Structure formats: structure tokens, C-alpha cells
């Protein structure tokens, strides 16, 4: 099966309030997704989704670190040629929490969690996907899970070996992540699942270059 996709989006952000330690902003957006699926030369599906989005974003200094929160609401709209099926008119809520804290001058702890919730049965493109690069490590090519309701938690410790504006920044790190999903109206064993994984790596960055080398291992899964 072959899939062809195209999309465009418009986003606007407005700072509502800020001081030396904190900032609060509001974001609104509109995106249109067009997906076509083919088996050989036969059109299998042709779907257009138009999605409205509103988010509230905040950051503040908290216990010697930086704490961030994003609340997001998405709604499928009957606009710009979108499909008029109930599945295309979904509602989805998301919450992202992150925390960055230097434990010493060189040792840094980072926490991130993303959770989403919908009472609707979502298209696969709108479900929260867990596993792979930028998510739970060790599931890059297989074992990814996705759901209408999901949560992902990541913890990372890194240590700054080099921190120089001239030659760059070099930091080894270790991380552990866990994710779980549940799909609506699917009582089978495939309607829910979880994965966990860990990675150890080396991260290097300078003005025009970023390199991240890591070994990732899947630890457990349903």
C-alpha cells in the first residue's frame, strides 16, 4: 500500500503575561491534512481533515529549575473540504509537562511527560504514537503503540564534559521512558498496551551542528 500526504497549517501566538521568571502565552492554529492511500493503482481511501487548535503555554522558575506546561485542545472541523463523518469531527485534549534542573554545575536532570485524551475513536494520524526516535527508545522499527488515550513519561540524566562556546558542548546521558495507551471501543487485547525502554548516549552541539549518538534498548512491553 502506498500513501500520499499533504498538509498546511497556520499558527498565531500571543504573550499574555511575563516577568523576569515566568511567561504565559496563548496559541491558536488551523491545519488541513489530505491523505490518499493506494493499492497498486487503485484508490483505497481519500481523506481530508481540518483541525482547529488552541493552546495555553506557561514557563516559570521552580526549585532552581525551569518548569513548563502546555494545555492543548484540538477539534475536527467541517471546513476547507474536510470529511463530514463523525470520526473527522473529533475532540482531543493534551497536556505536556517538562522540567529542567541542574543538580550540580555539570549534572542535569530532565523530565518530560505528554498525555492525551479523547472520547472519540481517532484516525491513526491523530492518535498519540509512542516508541522510537524522540519517544520511548528501543522501538524504532517495530513495536510502536498508539491510542486515543495515552501517556508517555521520560527521565534523563546528563553530564557536561565540555561546555565551551568555541569548541561546543559534549554531554553523555542516560534515559528511561515509559508509555501506555488505550483505544476506545476496542475491548480486545490489542485495545491497550504499554512499552518501556532505556538509552545511553553522547550528545554534542555547537552553533551550526548537533550530533546525538545513542544505544537504545527495549525493556518491557505488552
What do the PLM-derived regions correspond to, one by one?
Residues 9-11, 23-29, 55, 66-72, ...:
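Residue-level detector of the transmembrane beta-barrel scaffold of outer-membrane proteins
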Residues 36-169, 182-184:
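C-terminal outer-membrane beta-barrel translocator/porin domains of Gram-negative envelope proteins
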Residues 4-8, 46-52, 89-93, 147-153, ...:
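Residues that define the transmembrane beta-barrel architecture of outer-membrane proteins
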Residues 1, 9, 15, 29-35, ...:
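Outer-membrane beta-barrel pore domains and translocons
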Residues 136-140, 196, 216-221:
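Short beta-alpha connecting loops at secondary-structure transitions
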Residues 160-162, 171-198:
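Outer-membrane beta-barrel transmembrane domain signature
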Residues 1-65, 222:
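Gram-negative/organellar outer-membrane beta-barrel architecture
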Amino acid at each position: 500500500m502506498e500513501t500520499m500526504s499533504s498538509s498546511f497549517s497556520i499558527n498565531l501566538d500571543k504573550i499574555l503575561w511575563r516577568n523576569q521568571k515566568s511567561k504565559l502565552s496563548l496559541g491558536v492554529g488551523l491545519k488541513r491534512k489530505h491523505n490518499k492511500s493506494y493499492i497498486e493503482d487503485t484508490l483505497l481511501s481519500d481523506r481530508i481533515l481540518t483541525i482547529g487548535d488552541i493552546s495555553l503555554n506557561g514557563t516559570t522558575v521552580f526549585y532552581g529549575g525551569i518548569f513548563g506546561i502546555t494545555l492543548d485542545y484540538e477539534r475536527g472541523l467541517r471546513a476547507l473540504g474536510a470529511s463530514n463523518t463523525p470520526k473527522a469531527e473529533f475532540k482531543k485534549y493534551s497536556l505536556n509537562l517538562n522540567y529542567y534542573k541542574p543538580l550540580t554545575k555539570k549534572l542535569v536532570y530532565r523530565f518530560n511527560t505528554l498525555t492525551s485524551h479523547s472520547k472519540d475513536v481517532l484516525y491513526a494520524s491523530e492518535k498519540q504514537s509512542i516508541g522510537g526516535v524522540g519517544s520511548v527508545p528501543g522501538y524504532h522499527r517495530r513495536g510502536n503503540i498508539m491510542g486515543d488515550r495515552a501517556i508517555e513519561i521520560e527521565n534523563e540524566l546528563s553530564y557536561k564534559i565540555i561546555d565551551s562556546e568555541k569548541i561546543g558542548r559534549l554531554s553523555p546521558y542516560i534515559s528511561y521512558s515509559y508509555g501506555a495507551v488505550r483505544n476506545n471501543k476496542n475491548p480486545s487485547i490489542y485495545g491497550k498496551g504499554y512499552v518501556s525502554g532505556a538509552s545511553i548516549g553522547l550528545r554534542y552541539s555547537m552553533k551550526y551542528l548537533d550530533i546525538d549518538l545513542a544505544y537504545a534498548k527495549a525493556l518491557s512491553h505488552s
